[in-house]
Amino acid sequence: MKTRLLVAVVACCVALSSGVRAETIMAGTAAGLDEDSIALQGQRVRLWGIDAPSVDQTCKRGGKNWTCGRDAARALSGLVTGKTVRCLVIVEDKLRRLIVGDCTLGGESLSRWMIRNGWAVMNPRQTDAYAKEEAEAKEAKRGVWASEFEMPWDWRIRQRMKGKAP
């Protein structure tokens, strides 16, 4: 009896220390919230691996200001709202938004779709998995790549320095 208990305790300790964690899957009817976040099961879910222009960010297209951030948000919302989305949760970030590795709609990655259509850029601090799609969007001048734009992370830093936290 003591041997079985000891084996069970050791097995649990090994399993807990192995770094393996259970995958958390969220699924349900989604709604677009902003340029890189959706609402799913009453929670805010941020798409993993991308950074899109903030809703207040503008780009220059044809010498004129263009609300590229607002259009990125509209594109994501139009894609997901009212549809069933499935997300694999990776980690909860310091802003208490869920970051997910693979949010899909009909088997297609939402992050990959946003990048392929030029509505977001790859977040190099998270992944380089979308490099091919980003290069193709840039070459085809899709979305923000058809304009002059500041990388979203640089734009946010500049806004903070001006005292306008996005």
Give the residues covered by each predicted segment.
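Small beta-barrel nucleic-acid-binding modules, primarily SNase/OB-fold domains
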Residues: 2, 6, 13-166
